[in-house]
Amino acid sequence: MKIDYYEALGVTRTADDKTLKAAFRKLAMQYHPDRNPDDPEAERKFKEIGEAYETLKDPQKRAAYDRFGHAAFENGGMGGGFGNGFGGAGGFADIFEDIFGEMMGGGRRRSNGGRERGADLRYNMEVTLEEAYAGKTAQIRVPTSITCDECSGSGAKPGSQPTTCTMCSGSGRVRAAQGFFSVERTCPGCNGRGQIIKDPCEKCHGQGRVTQERSLSVNIPAGIEDGTRIRLAGEGEAGLRGGPAGDLYIFLSVKPHEFFQRDGADLYCKVPISMTTAALGGQFEVSTLDGTQTRVKVPEGTQNGKQFRLKGKGMPVLRQSVTGDLYIQIDIETPQNLSKRQRELLEEFEKLSSQENSPKSAGFFSRMKEFFEGIGE
């Protein structure tokens, strides 16, 4: 029984070209023979979806199929004007290559004379919170591959030239039959370069590039956070045989700070004050990341955990004219190692204290006493 092309792709009869292509791409990736070696069922499914897509992607063939079904492509069907159009191995390989070429940067992949883009590089950098606040220009040294100046990147000994690979005619790819269709693979004669180097450059050993440490200047903007990535285009490894260089990615991390904790653009810190300052009121100074000293007033009767907000004293937001706030939490320090006189004064203070001085604690113990007395009754 012949397959229904729409069912093979898992689409409706009203599916547009975009839906057809997406369905084919998904199924082709699933059933591709390279992913399912020695699996006849996967090969059969792969052939079915290829046949279905090749028919439905063509408006004329699709119209004929919608009207006459498979009879449109049988001998004599439609006056012999249509075939199944599968075109053997080469036709399907072209379809597959066209679609999946888009996933690899658009269009069909060709070695373009063996040129290869250089690899991207990663560099990890740690900065202080102060540097993240103000921004900085950092000098880094990066070991990387650069174009060989002896052979200008050709890989061939000066005075000689690479020759075109006869196996792939310079494309770097060869077509190989695999069952009912053919696929392109890297040329084994030149390893995908498209060229053969008979006399390699002695400095780079035919690679077209050498390893060297480079010094680069990196601008770190104010407001960066953990994981911020900076891209330096063209500062990665040199390309091969005239190919473009890769990029360098700087991954930034911010060191933990001794006093401040960060949450987005806001900063948090704890400031210890004495019990008497909390009770009588007072003030203290706090150093902020902009280098200034900010005076904070403590009102009488300040409780432990009280939070003060200093607007605009937090972190700048990356590439925006916005700054977060600084939140200061009060940490009341209980006195230790009391002298005899200090103890006497505190004991006297305790005797003079009333419920009005400590309403929360007085109310709590009163409620607790009433609770347990009620249980005993």
Swiss-Prot record:
Record-given protein name: Chaperone protein DnaJ
SMART domains: DnaJ (SM00271)
Keywords in alphabetical order: Chaperone, Cytoplasm, DNA replication, Metal-binding, Repeat, Stress response, Zinc, Zinc-finger
Cofactor(s) needed for function: Zn(2+)
Pfam families associated with the record: DnaJ, DnaJ_C, DnaJ_CXXCXGXG
CXXCXGXG motif repeats: from-to residues: 148-155, 165-172, 187-194, 201-208
Protein residues bound to Zn(2+) 2: 165, 168, 187, 190
PROSITE patterns the record matches: DNAJ_1, DNAJ_2, ZF_CR
ZnF bounds (CR-type): 135-213
Gene name per UniProt: dnaJ
